């Protein structure tokens, strides 16, 4: 479907960010709740699976898990929290026991498990790192649906164990200070933002200059300017000056690209 096609294109773009290797373990988050991070994570996971990749989707929002609701999966007692907090040594076999197949799609899902009293402590533990390393050896992509960035520190913690983070932005709703705060939270822990998905743009405004009609338009510095994005530039979806604009995204990406350039320069100088 259209959302899967565009999400597949998003991951293709992200794959070319690094000249050495494609991002394999990817955190997906947003500034605040209800901005579309979980549906974006699911669509990305399904599109990659349909393209032939071996994909695992992890529900890491241990406070308000939504994946079982969206995928209409039964709630299972065993999941991520149990693996991290359990006393037994983590192995590929023990991890595989708590994974679930999503229908006949080929997508594997690791649900959140029992709600723990200390999510941040679990996610910052050595066992979570060990789990990620086990999964790296088994899957082409591990997509992690994370909590929103601003209310809790969980996603910043998770992002340090990944190859980077995708931020999901709610068009015409996400505030500039919230986006910048999310960006800074990721940068502060030494992680990187791989890309931004602009989500929830009205379907009747998806009119591209090249004649393509897609859902979920997104900003990756592409050479097209959809009608909806022109409206964002004109602030027609932004009655308040606080609402995230095209210029705010441009400024954010200048900052992110400059940071990556400095990191790459340091890496080359250390060789």
Identify what each model region corresponds to.
Residues 1-271:
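P-loop NTP-binding module
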